[in-house]
Amino acid sequence: MSGLFIGRLVIESGLGTLAEAMDLYPGARIDVIGAGPEEARIAGHPRIRLFGRVGQSEVLARMREAAYLVLPSLSYEDVPRPLVEAFANGLPVIAARIGRLAELVEPGRNGLLFEAGSARDLARRLAWAEAFPEKMRQMGECAKADYRARFLADWNYPILFGERRRAARV
């Protein structure tokens, strides 16, 4: 069972937290897709496979193989594209409790949250994910349902235009 990280390899992506968590919990393996100045920090780690920049077909292939997506971000992001893609592909997300990540990831339903910057807390979540693969699969199903409910136009346009109609009447 392995996880997946997709993003820019920069300090604010939380790669230091991820690498430290991997040291604390030696059972985890993570595939990393992305490039950037923090690449050297994780390049030699024995349980991190670095793929660099890849095309969308390779991203989707890695998502199909992964048990979860990990987003150890240290910065307040709106809605990271990797989260949306993970949800669309039925992949639960283990994310830092920061910004919109804390709103979109519902612990025990579509993923798990850990305290931003805490390698120890992330290591605990990775260990839990490895210990309960069936629950993670169920969370992936919920993540896919959340994608349909929150991000697809055919679900959201009626809500948006209904609100606009109501606002126009006021």
Language-model segments: which ranges?
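Acidic donor-binding loop of glycosyltransferase active sites
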Residues: 64-78, 91
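Short alpha-helical segment that forms part of, or immediately flanks, the ligand-binding pocket
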Residues: 60, 78, 83-88, 102-103, ...
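Short hydrophobic beta-strand element within catalytic cores of glycosyltransferases
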Residues: 92-95, 105
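C-terminal alpha-helical cap of glycosyltransferases
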Residues: 149-170
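Nucleotide-activated donor-binding/catalytic signature segment of Leloir-type glycosyltransferases, i.e.
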Residues: 40-60
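A short, well-ordered alpha-helix in the C-terminal region of glycosyltransferases
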Residues: 128, 135-149
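Conserved donor-binding/catalytic core segment of Leloir-type glycosyltransferases
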Residues: 1-13, 19-23
